């Protein structure tokens, strides 16, 4: 409040303005402040200078200092950069207010219209470092004292709007409430300007306001006429937000926030949630702000089962409509999930009230996200030009789990204001549009990691924010259709509704091109003459020659002479799948019989897509080209390795064989997927035989078209049928397992425990390697293929396994959290195994401190960290408050500090380490959600491709009387679809490899914590069971380190192969 000795009423009004927490209170207190100073609100930047000059008040000086520093940046030219520009901003959301502030600082006249009359959204927004610095520079701590005082950086939408509203009012933005923008009113004649169509009954001054810049920030449901919008669809995704009353009690402040938990890497949490409450979620986030804010993604079947949804409807609007949602059940659902996630420490959860006085909980659909194809346009009529720009949700709808909405929204606001500045400087219209579109291309790729590190230098100029900026990435000629002279018909642009992934670059194109490539690859092999894409492959020799050509050493052509056609073809299909990553879409029977020519063409086109860059000269090559199949191949081998690890863990838990301290080095070569266990056939034998093993789905028994075929363990499925037997969730590559007892497929969360006593020795710990072709199962005269050139060697003898100990260096550990893993090229020889369990434990723990996303800190590193804290722009008077820690985190930090001897010497490192741990946790969560979203988009794109493929295949099979040219055209189109599908499947495999990396990282963190608990106990107090459990945890930890090392080596091998390929192409 104002000073007790102050007699100036303006001081009291200013204090009321600072402390106001309701929109109407902000407006009324500012009106009273201006009245006390003899000013009229909305006078532009000159108004700010008048308020500052007349309000000589100690409490305002720190705010004036901050705003003067911002306004004094050279880019604003002392508020004269856009003095002749008149702007209309639609929408008082965070992005609309932020762009209004920037335009006001440039000196433009800014009028903002908002249809609402109050701010009531409690939902919380995640803040990037630059947004924190940006808001602090605008006086955020002055307006909102609790701004970013916790371990997670966030702010509620309502508080952010209030903060920016106060800044906009001080800078002279003219704001009109309860006014709805309905469209543009073009100038009726020369000499007049553009106006807005507004409702209801706007004041005459506003109705007659003519402007030359319109910035739309009115949300995703309103995009001005002329802008094209693209829809990016995934599978059904239902989000739930809930706000509970924050009583700010001591108990509530001690409950740690949850930056994000995702099923994709922490399935145990959601399995426990399901068992305890019956609630099935994909992810959950908890932020503590004005309210206790929870947001989660729920599964539809769970909502139906628990009565939250009355009825299942295919239309999402009807499914989540108010008539189909039971409010009381939704409240029980969210309360139970929130209570479980916080271990019941929040006490009795009471819902906050929304704008309508109802409990603030809602379910929403984010299956599809809208994105404008362009960010700006120019319209001209009667010589009057209007620049239109988009910011906020009407530009790009954010994907809420990533927390990118406000950060990228602010970046778009800065870019839009920069565009207006260039417009005001007199730059050519097409040049302004081209620069804006060049910046827009960067927006969706922007993250804190790929922007400039020094956030203090960020400003309106894009060069201060984006490294390696190219403002000419889009040329003026490419944006001519964005300049619309209304006397002409506007140019219509293609509006694709679905992102189907990468284009079909390098596809086979036509049958003739595919046949020519196959002839080049198989030329010179004895007994092989390829003249067509059907009968030439019936004896299996051509297919074996193709496999040998692409990966020498897998099949020796001389050993194939005299084999049966079916045996040779089946063997080639298996080897191609296990060693080249070429998943079959046609059965061996169909190839030999020639009954599925389209399937064979699709299969051969996969070879072409994966190895199209190989030399055309006949004869073997030393190394296979890194094609799209490499990720599929590695994921397949990684999945088999993880399945063996889970089998060994289950055997250990059941009291199996004695375990080894060292991880067996995995050298997979010619592993063949195990045959399904007898007992429960996936399809009736008669149907299976009749279909030739490829025409019918092994689950539903319906017909399979070429584009629909998904091959798993030798069986073909519809992708839509291949779901978890328990929860019916989509099974992603690397994320499922077939139960040997019932033959069904399960996601890892619902995989039943195996009864090892009943399994026999085939799958027990005595058989760590999957079966390889034996003399009885191999064709006569055909030996086991030799090691592939990708590093696989002969299958080791289980009785004499190859063993090695792996130590990860600090750079390698840091690169584990990145998608581009590049380990050191020179690796030290493996150290000798430690002699004792304690020594091995210390070695494993010193190798990685992934629980906090940091390597073990040396005293020198902590000194640097301490210095960074003191010099950080977030410190000084606006430093974050320290927060209580939960017991587990406190124990881990204290243990680490005691062993490092740093607890007393460096008082700020504890808070810094905790904050960085939360940041790493948030990064992992965001990475997981990005992957999940892209997987959903790929699934939707594959469904569309399959539908198109079915139509083409039906046309080819039924229209026998169609002209030959038409058939060739259809086949060419089918090949393009197959190539697109292969590209999407390869991208899917890449994403799932990253999922496995996240899984291993999460498991290693958990094992780290568990092992530390055992190590911290006094040795004389440990029981035999404790020592046995410690040994078991240690072995699991070493196993995980080796598996993560395999991921590093795979990424490095791919990087080197691609680099070599690129160098060869340039040469």
Swiss-Prot record:
<feature type="compositionally biased region" description="Acidic residues">
    <location>
        <begin position="876"/>
        <end position="886"/>
    </location>
</feature>
<dbReference type="GO" id="GO:0051017">
    <property type="term" value="P:actin filament bundle assembly"/>
</dbReference>
<feature type="region of interest" description="Disordered">
    <location>
        <begin position="755"/>
        <end position="838"/>
    </location>
</feature>
<feature type="region of interest" description="Disordered">
    <location>
        <begin position="645"/>
        <end position="688"/>
    </location>
</feature>
<feature type="region of interest" description="Important for interaction with RAB8A">
    <location>
        <begin position="901"/>
        <end position="1067"/>
    </location>
</feature>
<dbReference type="InterPro" id="IPR002938">
    <property type="entry name" value="FAD-bd"/>
</dbReference>
<feature type="compositionally biased region" description="Basic and acidic residues">
    <location>
        <begin position="755"/>
        <end position="766"/>
    </location>
</feature>
<dbReference type="GO" id="GO:0045171">
    <property type="term" value="C:intercellular bridge"/>
</dbReference>
<feature type="modified residue" description="Phosphoserine">
    <location>
        <position position="617"/>
    </location>
</feature>
<dbReference type="GO" id="GO:0019417">
    <property type="term" value="P:sulfur oxidation"/>
</dbReference>
<keyword id="KW-0560">Oxidoreductase</keyword>
<keyword id="KW-0285">Flavoprotein</keyword>
<keyword id="KW-0967">Endosome</keyword>
<dbReference type="GO" id="GO:0005737">
    <property type="term" value="C:cytoplasm"/>
</dbReference>
<keyword id="KW-0009">Actin-binding</keyword>
<dbReference type="InterPro" id="IPR001781">
    <property type="entry name" value="Znf_LIM"/>
</dbReference>
<dbReference type="GO" id="GO:1990026">
    <property type="term" value="C:hippocampal mossy fiber expansion"/>
</dbReference>
<dbReference type="Pfam" id="PF00307">
    <property type="entry name" value="CH"/>
</dbReference>
<feature type="binding site">
    <location>
        <position position="718"/>
    </location>
    <ligand>
        <name>Zn(2+) 1</name>
    </ligand>
</feature>
<dbReference type="GO" id="GO:0016709">
    <property type="term" value="F:oxidoreductase activity, acting on paired donors, with incorporation or reduction of molecular oxygen, NAD(P)H as one donor, and incorporation of one atom of oxygen"/>
</dbReference>
<comment type="similarity">
    <text>Belongs to the Mical family.</text>
</comment>
<keyword id="KW-0440">LIM domain</keyword>
<dbReference type="GO" id="GO:0046872">
    <property type="term" value="F:metal ion binding"/>
</dbReference>
<dbReference type="InterPro" id="IPR036188">
    <property type="entry name" value="FAD/NAD-bd_sf"/>
</dbReference>
<dbReference type="InterPro" id="IPR050540">
    <property type="entry name" value="F-actin_Monoox_Mical"/>
</dbReference>
<feature type="binding site">
    <location>
        <position position="721"/>
    </location>
    <ligand>
        <name>Zn(2+) 1</name>
    </ligand>
</feature>
<comment type="subunit">
    <text>Interacts with STK38 and STK38L. Interacts with RAB1B, RAB8A, RAB10, RAB13, RAB15 and RAB35 (in their GTP-bound forms); binding to RAB1B is of low affinity compared to other Rab proteins; at least in case of RAB8A and RAB10 can bind 2 molecules of the Rab proteins simultaneously; ternary complex formation of RAB8A, RAB13 and MICAL1 is possible. Associates with the SH3 domain of NEDD9. Interacts with VIM and PLXNA3. Interacts with GRAF1/ARHGAP26, GRAF2/ARHGAP10, RAB8A, RAB8B and RAB10; may bind simultaneously to GRAFs and Rabs and connects GRAFs to Rabs. Does not interact with RAB1 and RAB11A.</text>
</comment>
<dbReference type="GO" id="GO:0005884">
    <property type="term" value="C:actin filament"/>
</dbReference>
<keyword id="KW-0472">Membrane</keyword>
<feature type="modified residue" description="Phosphoserine">
    <location>
        <position position="876"/>
    </location>
</feature>
<dbReference type="Pfam" id="PF00412">
    <property type="entry name" value="LIM"/>
</dbReference>
<feature type="binding site">
    <location>
        <position position="95"/>
    </location>
    <ligand>
        <name>FAD</name>
    </ligand>
</feature>
<feature type="binding site">
    <location>
        <begin position="114"/>
        <end position="116"/>
    </location>
    <ligand>
        <name>FAD</name>
    </ligand>
</feature>
<dbReference type="InterPro" id="IPR036872">
    <property type="entry name" value="CH_dom_sf"/>
</dbReference>
<feature type="binding site">
    <location>
        <position position="181"/>
    </location>
    <ligand>
        <name>FAD</name>
    </ligand>
</feature>
<keyword id="KW-0521">NADP</keyword>
<feature type="region of interest" description="Monooxygenase domain">
    <location>
        <begin position="1"/>
        <end position="489"/>
    </location>
</feature>
<feature type="domain" description="Calponin-homology (CH)">
    <location>
        <begin position="508"/>
        <end position="612"/>
    </location>
</feature>
<dbReference type="GO" id="GO:0003779">
    <property type="term" value="F:actin binding"/>
</dbReference>
<dbReference type="GO" id="GO:0043066">
    <property type="term" value="P:negative regulation of apoptotic process"/>
</dbReference>
<dbReference type="InterPro" id="IPR022735">
    <property type="entry name" value="bMERB_dom"/>
</dbReference>
<keyword id="KW-0597">Phosphoprotein</keyword>
